[in-house]
Amino acid sequence: MAKRVQVVLNETVNKLGRMGQVVEVAPGYARNYLFPRGIAEPATPSALRRVERLQEKERQRLAALKSIAEKQKATLEKLATITISMPVGEKDMLFGSVTPQDVADAIQAITGETIDRREMILPEIRKLGTYTAEIKLHPEVTVKLNIQVVAD
């Protein structure tokens, strides 16, 4: 009996590999766990060709997402500063703070671009002034924006 068998993963498995990856596992693990649950299949030539096609489609999808992110970056870099007006109390302190959602709403109002608030890195904004925000549009594409907070 073979010591190890090669399988193609149909799903990502912790501590084993990502979907589409060819890995070597014990024959019993493959036969009793991976194959019955549909997590993996034997590394046959047809399975390897199918995985290669899927990986090519994924590469194309990621390239398209990156080009969209580059276009968004160009649009956002045209904005010198985003101005957000907030109600102010004593000593130029804001009532509350400026949140990533406030910045995303301001960007959408100005440019029409939808930005995910979870992809923003903002300092704590509790006073009037100018701050710098970093927005991660794609793992390889980030943009820095100036945010000016003014009184209502």
From Swiss-Prot:
Signal peptide: none
Protein biosynthesis listed as a keyword: no
Keywords, comma-separated and alphabetical: Ribonucleoprotein, Ribosomal protein, RNA-binding, rRNA-binding
Alphabetical list of Pfam families matching this protein: Ribosomal_L9_C (PF03948), Ribosomal_L9_N (PF01281)
Protein name listed in UniProt: Large ribosomal subunit protein bL9
One term of GO molecular function: structural constituent of ribosome
One GO CC term on file: ribosome
GO BP of this protein: translation
Main function: Binds to the 23S rRNA.
Family under the similarity heading: Belongs to the bacterial ribosomal protein bL9 family.
